[in-house]
Amino acid sequence: MDEEYEVIVLGTGLKECILSGLLSVDGLKVLHMDRNDYYGGESTSLNLNQLWKKFRGEEKAPAHLGSSRDYNVDMMPKFMMANGKLVRVLIHTDVTKYLSFKAVDGSYVFVQGKVQKVPATPMEALKSPLMGIFEKRRAGKFFSYVQEYDEKDPKTHDGMDLRRVTTKDLIAKFGLKEDTIDFIGHAVALHCNDNHLHQPAYDTVMRMKLYAESLARFQGGSPYIYPLYGLGELPQAFARLSAVYGGTYMLNKPECKVEFDEEGKVSGVTSEGETAKCKKVVCDPSYLTNKVRKIGRVARAIAIMSHPIPNTNDSQSVQVILPQKQLGRKSDMYVFCCSYSHNVAPKGKFIAFVSTDAETDNPQTELQPGIDLLGPVDELFFDIYDRYEPVNEPTLDNCFISTSYDATTHFDTTVVDVLNMYKLITGKELDLSVDLNAASAAEEE
Amino acid sequence: MSSRRRVLLKVIILGDSGVGKTSLMNQFVNRKFSNQYKATIGADFLTKEVQIDDRIFTLQIWDTAGQERFQSLGVAFYRGADCCVLVYDVNVMKSFDNLNNWREEFLIQASPSDPENFPFVVLGNKTDVDGGKSRVVSEKKAKAWCASKGNIPYFETSAKEGFNVDAAFECITKNAFKNEPEEEPYLPDTIDVAGGQQQRSTGCEC
C-alpha cells in the first residue's frame, strides 16, 4: 500500500469484481481489497468447513459428509439466464475462458399446492396440467403475440402501445385465467411480486422474450445455466481479469477504513496502518455503513440432502418458484437446488436453498412452505440478513456503493446495478450488444 | 495425425513476485524475453503443444497474473492442476526460503487426493545474472530441499538465455501426465457459453 490508485475497490463480491475487471480493462489503476481471506464476500461459495464455521461456530464438519473441498455452497444462490445480461458481460469481457457451465435441468413452479414443470417444449406445454385445453389455446395466442412483438414494427403491436398499456390490460385482451397469469408473471417473466400487473406491459413482454430466447439457446430443460464449482467461481474469474490487466489484489485486509478530505471527498483507504490514496472508492455496503440504508431482509434456508427435490423428475439442478399469491405473501419464494452434477457437492449429495424477502419478525417460519418441498434433509442452516442500498451522492464524495443482493434466483438485478454503477463511475455506457451468433461464427474461424 | 487422444494438462507456476515466472512461461511458449520488469500485467494462461515420443500433450500453463504479490490467489486458480512448478530466484535467498510456503499453500488450496505423490517441479531461475556472481542459493542447498520434499525434480534455468527451459518443461509435462488419473474423472457435460448454437427460428417465413 502507501501508493496512489485511481480506484480502490472494497469487498470482492460479484458486483465489485465485475467492476474491478471492467475498470482495469479500461486502463484505470485499480487496487482491490477484502477483509476476508477468500474471494466473493457475501456472494462467495463456502467449502464444508467454512460453512460449519460460519453457521455452527465449529472448525470441522462431520466426516461422514465427505471432503470439505468437494463442497461449494453458494451464499447467494442464483441461476444465470442463458441469454441474460450476465452472460453478455461474461462474453464481452472474455471471462468465459476461466469458467465451465452446464445447463440447469429444470424450472418448476408451485401452483395449487403442487410442483409443476414450466414447459420447455411445445410438447411439454400440450401435456402440462398447468392449464386446461381452452386456456392453453388462449395462452398459446398470448405467447405467439409476445414472440412476434417487435417494438420497431407497429404491425406486431396489434394496436397496443406497450409503453402505456398495463400488463393486466394486455393479458385481459387474451382472456387468461388467474393461475395462468400467476404462472406467466412469476415463472416466465420472473417478476418477484404482482406490481408488474399495473405497470406498462413492455417490461414483462421483454422478460418473456428473454425466457424464450434463453430456453432456445442451449435447448436444455430450462433457460438457466450454472457454473461448475458454484457461483464463487464468478468473482474469482472477474478478479483474475482485473489482475491480468494490472489490478492489484490484497485479500485478508482487516478494517479497511475509507478516508475523506475536508470537502468530504474520498481521499484514500487505510488498513493495518498504511494508507493508499485514490480518487474513487467502489464498495459493498458493509464497508461504508454510514452511507447506506436498510431496505429489507432476506431469509434463506440452506440444506444438505442425499436426494433430488421430490416431484422434479430426479433433476440434479432445479429451480422452483413459489409465486406470492400461491403462498399468501407479498413476494415470491424461491427454491434452488444443485448437486454433484455441477461439482458443488460430493457424489450423491445435493445442496438446496429456500430464499425469500422476510416479511415478519419470524423469517425462519416464513420459509417453511419452501422447506416442505425439499423432503428429508441431512443438515439445515438459516441465513437471515439485511439488505442495504446507498444513500450518498457519488458526485459529491466519489463513493460508489453497490446494493445488497436480493432473494431472487436470477441475476438480472445484479447486473443492472453493476451497469448503473459503471456508468456513474466512468460516465460511459457499457455496450453489451454481443451478437451471440457472431461469437459462434468467430469461434469457427 | 496420431489417433491417440490428446491430453490437456493444467500446469500452474508459483513463486514470489519477481522471480521470473512470467518470463519462463513466455520463453517456453513464445521464445521471447523482456528485460523490463513490471509486476505481471497481461499474463494469463498460455497453451503449448508438446510432443514427447509419439504422444502429443497440450500444456495449459497458468501464470499468477500478479495476484501472488499479496497472497491473493483464489481457490479457482489451483483447482485441477496436474503439476505445480515452484520458481525461485537463485540470487534472492528469501525467494528460496518461501518455496516451502508456496508448496504448503498449494497443498492446502488444491487439496490433491494424493498429496504425498503430487508432482512438483522446482526451477532455480536467473542463473545468468552477473554471470553467476550474485548467486546466493547453492545448487547443493536447493537439491537437498527438493530431496527432502519427496525428490522433487530440480532444474536451474535462465529465462533470459533460454537455458534449460525446454528440459524443465519436458519434465513438467511427463510428471503432469503421470498424475493424470487413469480412469476418466467425473466430467459433467458442459456447454459453450461464448459460442452457442444458432437460435432456433420462431415461425417459418413462408
From Swiss-Prot, chain A:
Highest taxon in the source lineage: Eukaryota
Keyword field: GTPase activation
Tissue-specificity statement: Expressed in roots, rosette leaves, stems, floral buds and siliques.
UniProt cross-references to Gene3D superfamilies, sorted A to Z: FAD/NAD(P)-binding domain, Guanine Nucleotide Dissociation Inhibitor, domain 1, Guanine Nucleotide Dissociation Inhibitor, domain 2
Cited InterPro entries: FAD/NAD-bd_sf, GDP_dissociation_inhibitor, RabGDI
Protein family per UniProt: Belongs to the Rab GDI family.
Role summary: Regulates the GDP/GTP exchange reaction of most RAB proteins by inhibiting the dissociation of GDP from them, and the subsequent binding of GTP.
Subunit structure: Interacts with the GDP-bound form of RABA5C (via C-terminus).
Name of the protein this chain belongs to: Guanosine nucleotide diphosphate dissociation inhibitor 1
Species: Arabidopsis thaliana (Mouse-ear cress)
UniProtKB/Swiss-Prot annotation, chain B:
Membrane topology value: Lipid-anchor
Ranges in coiled-coil conformation: none
MF-aspect GO terms: GTP binding; GTPase activity
CDD domains: Rab7 (cd01862)
UniProt xrefs under InterPro entries: P-loop_NTPase, Small_GTP-bd, Small_GTPase
GO cellular component, one term: nucleus
BP GO annotations: protein transport
Motif (Effector region): 37-45
Gene3D superfamilies per UniProt: P-loop containing nucleotide triphosphate hydrolases
Keywords, ordered alphabetically: Cell membrane, GTP-binding, Lipoprotein, Membrane, Methylation, Nucleotide-binding, Prenylation, Protein transport, Transport
Free-text function comment from the UniProt entry: Intracellular vesicle trafficking and protein transport.
Protein's name in the database: Ras-related protein RABG3d
